[in-house]
Amino acid sequence: MKKIQTFIQTSPVCSYTEWDLLEEIIVGVVDGACIPPWHAAMEPCLPTQQHQFFRDNAGKPFPQERIDLARKELDEFARILECEGVKVRRPEPKNQSLVYGAPGWSSTGMYAAMPRDVLLVVGTDIIECPLAWRSRYFETAAYKKLLKEYFHGGAKWSSGPKPELSDEQYVDGWVEDEAATSANLVITEFEPTFDAADFTRLGKDIIAQKSNVTNEFGINWLQRHLGDDYKIHVLEFNDMHPMHIDATLVPLAPGKLLINPERVQKMPEIFRGWDAIHAPKPIMPDSHPLYMTSKWINMNILMLDERRVVVERQDEPMIKAMKGAGFEPILCDFRNFNSFGGSFHCATVDIRRRGKLESYLV
């Protein structure tokens, strides 16, 4: 036990929850962001009104003015975190327009804006996730320099099975089933794939959902990889197009949970005794472009500890809700970054939080 404790104390990577005191974080970069080539796996994940935009502009850069505005907000976000005492690291921008591939397919890239999706930190283990989108196949390349540094510093560096992403991984001829009562997922169980953003950490317990990028095979692989110290609980929500859990259910602190009232209509039994804070209805105007998400991206907040929380500056209802629940909102403009498919949690992966492995569920 003494050896384990020493390893944890010296590892540069160590994080067990979404709320322990944040000491180090990676903030993404939006430079060079490209619109991914259209693929059937994207259809159930993207807003219907954006499908034609992606089809018409596949492989092209995102509008430069959008990139510039988002970069400005990201840099300010990083500055705010540093002012709050957090060490901020950034990935290396990569040329997303380069063509790459594997047997049977080719693609260009997308961006390195959302480290939350591609890297999962559980304890002292930083895991590269086997992503389901072909356009994200080499996305972790932007983080390799940091990953090597963390490994040399004592962290455990793991990687999920590198997927083939052949046609067998996707439902042939997928179409929306209007009569379905549960999500009609576009990925199969051919091989394990998962995005880190379909998991949220509560010490010894990890909440997960199956989605259009995360399959049961991937969840089972992760559970076996993590071993008996952790238990993954797979929950199903009232979401017909699941992709990433942070706009559905967000642990804020021990015993406090932010929930999407449209998707979480009944409190999961494992959260018995927890306080449920209903996320206020988003107020983002319809005129603001959201290429990849719904307006519920307003739930994608970031806890710096059990009290401080980063919230979008213009989201007055969320600011009020956080204050009412006893939290201290730290405000940051982020709507232009929201256009690219994420907010504060998506734009980051916490590398080190000051805490220990505990159980918080009944």
Swiss-Prot record:
MF (Gene Ontology): glycine amidinotransferase activity
KW Ubl conjugation (keyword) present: no
UniProt keyword annotation of Transcription regulation present: no
Catalytic reactions of this protein: L-lysine + L-arginine = L-homoarginine + L-ornithine; L-canavanine + L-ornithine = L-canaline + L-arginine + H(+)
Effect of residue 240 to P: No change in activity and substrate specificity
Catalytic activity, EC: 2.1.4.3
Knockout-associated phenotype: Mutant loses the ability to synthesize homoarginine and phaseolotoxin under permissive conditions.
Impact noted for substituting residue 243 to S: Abolishes amidinotransferase activity
Matches recorded under InterPro entries: AmidinoTrfase (IPR033195)
Catalytic residues of the enzyme: 195, 244, 346 (amidino-cysteine intermediate)
SUPFAM superfamilies: Pentein
SS bonds (residue pairs): none
Enzyme class: transferase
Keyword terms: Transferase
Biological process, per Gene Ontology: creatine biosynthetic process
General function of this protein: Involved in the biosynthesis of phaseolotoxin, a nonhost-specific toxin which is a key component in the development of the halo blight disease of beans. Catalyzes the transfer of an amidino group from arginine to lysine to produce one molecule of homoarginine and one molecule of ornithine, both being precursors in the biosynthesis of phaseolotoxin. Can also use L-canavanine as an alternative amidine donor with L-ornithine as amidine acceptor.
Similarity remark: Belongs to the amidinotransferase family.
UniProt-recorded name of the protein: L-arginine:L-lysine amidinotransferase
Organism: Pseudomonas savastanoi pv. phaseolicola
Taxonomic lineage from the root: Bacteria, Pseudomonadati, Pseudomonadota, Gammaproteobacteria, Pseudomonadales
